[in-house]
A protein has these predicted regions:
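Extracytoplasmic/lumenal domain signature
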Residues: 35-80, 88, 95-249, 254-533
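Bacterial signal peptide processing site
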Residues: 10-12
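Sec-dependent signal peptide recognition
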Residues: 1-2
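Post-signal peptide N-terminal segment of mature Sec-exported envelope proteins
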Residues: 14-47
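C-terminal motif of bacterial Sec signal peptides marking the signal peptidase cleavage site
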Residues: 6-8
């Protein structure tokens, strides 16, 4: 009723004024949506202690007072933001050693250049041994300018540098494009069998594990590459070590760029965590470290064969390694304490390869030698759940070593290669002296079942780890070198041989690849670059 009264009593309205002229508004671009908030940081992996497997494992942590063992000890998912291959098998997962992709489908291998090394004493001489993988880096400009040893190469924006440790006891520096030396070789005093590692932050900091005590105390030597000065020495002869008679470092360590820590295993049986306390000034051309050291020491029931020859694998706060007695362990790096162990049954020198699956499961691939079990026996190829240590499958292969005239071990020395892309369903193993004392095998297994998909029989045994290469269309290939000096390019889906090239000398080392050029050393005092075309 109230609404009706208001309508009746309202004064009649005047006619409305004419509408104002339209206002022309220039079109405005559609506002950009606000970027999503940054993803929360990756959390550490919390694993309960497996009391069943660790029941009789004696372990202790021997640490300098200043070593921080805290939640910050998480490896980033990306090892380096710079271009290159910085450590054995590329990073913490130890999954591959290639940076970049090929262009077109490859069908040819050719030698681009070769460099001759010096020689040490017999029987090591020169060239490269096992594992002997180089690092390859395209230096950030500010870092390149901070290294006077590069000379005129400091101004070369296109420089990609190969850094190769050698059995001659030196580290060699080579221009990937030309094969010419970029700076003087760096003498370490003892033969280098393993693979050097470079600071993934791009800092000119090089870690060199020595393999043979020829001229001076053996251990891990750390060099700054500004003036080629040794800034730290970790002696392999460690009074805390369970194995006192051998102090080699064939293992290639990992540097956590978020925490300034370096983790490495020694053949003396200790696992080391070094808080580096790095102080680098690229303008003043100075780099110093003042490491504080934590040592993880353990004793596993029935295993007196100490020594870590493989390169530690890691994912976030978890690290994985095996020893000369076949004890595999998962270590929480925040506390340097074990979470589980697995007894493989024999010496395990091959580095453990990790894989993060599409459904966020962490898997571990490993294989044993035929060593402590006798000259003839079985090598075991395995897939484990990396969070529990439980095997998901295992496959055995018969191999033949020898006891006389000298002891020769058989089995697997090469790191397993989990396939990616079009071969993401496959994992590749290289077998040495299997089935006979001179033979080798490359075998592709189904990741889910362990079933054999293909195999390639080799006329010679092999210790070298293959590299997976991918072309622009996503097709996958394997590059592999063996005893006898033959480098093979295989179609990864079938094992079909596409190309070969013959090098001088036996190949014990593993290659690194940058783009379509691989670098690989031999025992004939040579370092080669091989083009994959």
């Amino acid at each position: 009723m109230l609404g009706l009264l208001l309508s009746v009593c309202r004064t009649p309205e005047r006619p409305p004024p004419p509408p104002p002229p339209p206002v022309v508004v220039a079109p405005q671009p559609t506002p950009e949506p606000e970027p999503p908030p940054p993803a929360p940081p990756k959390l550490s992996i919390e694993l309960p202690t497996d009391s069943r497997t660790l029941r009789m494992l004696d372990r202790e942590l021997l640490a300098d007072a200043g070593v921080p063992l805290a939640d910050a000890q998480l490896f980033p998912d990306t090892y380096s933001v710079h271009e290159g291959v910085f450590t054995f098998r590329g990073g913490p997962l130890r999954a591959n050693a290639a940076f970049g992709t090929l262009g077109a489908k490859p069908s040819k291998l050719s030698i681009a250049w070769s460099v001759t090394t010096g020689q040490s004493k017999a029987p090591w001489f020169g060239g490269t041994g096992w594992t002997g993988q180089p690092v390859i880096v395209k230096w950030p400009a500010v870092i390149r300018h901070s290294m006077p040893k590069l000379g005129a190469k400091r101004q070369d924006d296109a420089l990609i540098e190969v850094i190769q440790g050698s059995l001659d006891g030196a580290v060699h520096f080579i221009d990937l494009a030309t094969g010419k030396r970029t700076r003087p070789a760096l003498s370490t005093g003892n033969p280098i069998k393993g693979s050097v590692s470079l600071d993934p932050r791009g800092y000119p900091l090089l870690f060199v594990g020595q393999g043979i005590p020829e001229n001076k105390p053996i251990g891990l030597r750390v060099f700054e590459l500004i003036n080629h000065t040794e800034v730290f020495f970790l002696p392999g002869s460690d009074k805390s070590a369970p194995r006192r008679g051998w102090g080699a470092f064939d293992s290639s360590g990992l540097l956590n760029r978020n925490t300034d820590t370096y983790v490495v295993g020694g053949e003396n049986g200790l696992l080391y965590l070094l808080k580096l306390n790095t102080n680098f000034d690229p303008l003043e051309l100075t780099l110093h470290v003042a490491p504080e050291v934590a040592r993880y020491r353990y004793q596993s029931p029935g295993n007196q064969n100490y020594g870590i020859e493989n390169s530690l694998s890691a994912f976030r706060n978890l690290a994985f390694f095996a020893d000369n007695g076949g004890t595999l362990q998962a270590i929480d790096l925040r506390t340097m304490s074990p979470r589980w162990k697995f007894e493989a049954g024999d010496d395990t020198d091959a580095t453990l390869a990790l894989e993060l699956t599409r459904d966020e499961q962490l898997k571990l691939y490993t294989a044993t030698e035929v060593d402590k079990t006798g000259p003839r026996g079985e090598t075991w190829l395995r897939k484990l759940d990396a969070l529990t240590g439980k095997p998901e499958w295992e496959v055995s292969e018969v191999c033949q070593g020898a006891l006389a005239p000298k002891k020769i071990d058989a089995g697997v020395f090469a790191t397993p290669l989990p396939g990616t892309g079009e071969v993401s369903h496959l994992v590749f193993f290289v077998l040495s002296r299997c089935p006979g004392p001179e033979n080798g095998v490359i075998v592709a297994l189904d990741k889910d079942t362990g079933g054999e998909i293909w195999r390639v029989d080799l006329p010679h045994f092999s210790w070298s780890t293959p590299v997976q290469l991918n072309d622009a269309d996503g097709h996958a290939y394997l590059l592999h070198g063996g005893i006898g000096g033959v480098v093979r390019l295989l179609e990864a889906t079938t094992g079909r041989q596409l190309a070969t090239v013959q090098l001088e000398g036996d190949i014990e080392s593993s290659p690194s690849v940058f783009g379509s050029r691989a670098v690989l050393g031999t025992r004939a005092n040579r370092i080669y670059a091989i083009d994959v075309k």
